[in-house]
């Protein structure tokens, strides 16, 4: 793992997003999802009421691993090893115990596997609301695919439809709605019903 440690803003929130690990650009930027995958992801969340700035100030952003894992031999970012995941898990577990979130949004297969280790395919969990339990906490889980430009899953079927379904579920969730309630101009309930 290559420092620095990258974390989101220390915001108390009923919603917790869990990513995989920072990319090479996130360390210098000092924040998670600071590059192209983030632009895609924040576009998704803007469609259900929170732009990037609002999201970063209202949603707690965690990660399975806190440092850039380095590049993979074949290109792209290396997926953290099981030992690296285990070494970092205490941080995410502590965050869950402090926040006690009502909604957890794991982004990408590694984050999803922390809650559902037997899930093999994204289509098994994207577009569904499930109950999750980790670190002695119980919460709703609505998973999203990783927004990486290298992945076509969220741009082709069935991923495109399942992503839209997942985002609608997030937008309708009471924990998400509570984030919008602090600013009535952010309420998208009419557009979600349309």
Show where each model-derived region lies:
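A polyanion-binding, active-site-adjacent surface
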Residues: 1-128, 133-183
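Short, basic, low-complexity termini and linkers enriched in Ser/Thr/Gly/Pro
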Residues: 182-192
């Amino acid at each position: 793992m290559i420092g620095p440690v990258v974390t989101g803003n220390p915001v108390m929130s009923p919603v917790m997003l869990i990513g995989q690990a920072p990319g090479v650009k996130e360390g210098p930027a000092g924040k998670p999802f600071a590059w192209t995958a983030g632009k895609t992801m924040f576009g998704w969340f803007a469609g259900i009421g929170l732009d990037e700035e609002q999201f970063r100030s209202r949603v707690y952003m965690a990660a399975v691993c806190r440092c850039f894992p380095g590049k993979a031999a074949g290109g792209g970012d290396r997926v953290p090893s099981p030992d690296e995941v285990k070494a970092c898990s205490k941080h995410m577990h502590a965050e869950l115990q402090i926040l006690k979130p009502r909604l957890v949004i794991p982004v990408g297969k590694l984050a999803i596997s922390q809650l559902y280790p037997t899930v093999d395919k994204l289509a098994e969990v994207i577009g569904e609301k499930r109950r999750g339990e980790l670190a002695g906490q119980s919460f709703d889980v609505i998973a999203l695919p990783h927004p990486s430009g290298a992945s076509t899953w969220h741009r082709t079927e069935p991923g495109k439809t399942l992503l839209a379904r997942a985002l609608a579920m997030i937008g309708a969730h009471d924990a998400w709605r509570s984030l919008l309630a602090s600013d009535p101009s952010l309420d998208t309930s009419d557009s979600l019903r349309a």
